[in-house]
């Protein structure tokens, strides 16, 4: 049996037809994303990305390897609440950045400039967020009784639903290096 090169031009024809149809539509409306950032190269966006990278590293330096000891010590509810609030603020910031980048890209997925912008944002935020992976893993290694005690009274009780959601993943959690 000999293999013959395919002469199927259907995908190319479909792409050309889509391009012609898009051109026929004229200028389409665009989302106003100014509530997130004024532009892809705005100082506010660039500053938030840099701050996210720095703050993720600082978060890891401050909290990595310490959650179990904090839970066993005095003022566990207050200290763990501080850690969860720090984590929450970082997740909000990173989410804002990626929401903006994703919406910019979704506005015109054929624009290579937007595709590069989205890819660059994804790479930087993925790298930064790798410094946050330890947090939920460590929460799941805390003794159940100690964590329940910390959540029973004090400000950590506010985060009980989120912590319980994190704890549901405990049976499926892998070793830190594999995660």
What is the meaning of each model-derived region?
Residues 2-179:
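A well-structured
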């Amino acid at each position: 049996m000999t293999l013959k090169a395919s002469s199927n031009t259907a995908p190319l024809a479909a792409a050309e037809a889509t391009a012609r149809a898009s051109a026929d539509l004229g200028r389409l409306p665009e989302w106003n994303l100014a509530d997130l950032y004024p532009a892809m190269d705005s100082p506010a966006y660039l500053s938030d990305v840099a701050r996210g990278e720095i703050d993720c590293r600082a978060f890891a330096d401050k909290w990595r390897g310490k959650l179990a000891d904090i839970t066993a010590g005095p003022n566990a509810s207050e200290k763990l609440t501080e850690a969860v609030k720090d984590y929450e603020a970082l997740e909000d910031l990173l989410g804002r950045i990626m929401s903006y980048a994703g919406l910019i890209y979704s506005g015109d997925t054929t624009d290579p400039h937007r595709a590069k912008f989205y890819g660059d944002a994804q790479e930087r935020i993925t790298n930064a967020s790798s410094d946050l992976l330890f947090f939920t893993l460590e929460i799941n290694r805390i003794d159940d009784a100690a964590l329940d005690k910390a959540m029973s009274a004090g400000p950590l009780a506010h985060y009980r639903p989120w912590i319980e959601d994190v704890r549901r993943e405990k049976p499926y959690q892998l070793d830190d290096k594999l995660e």
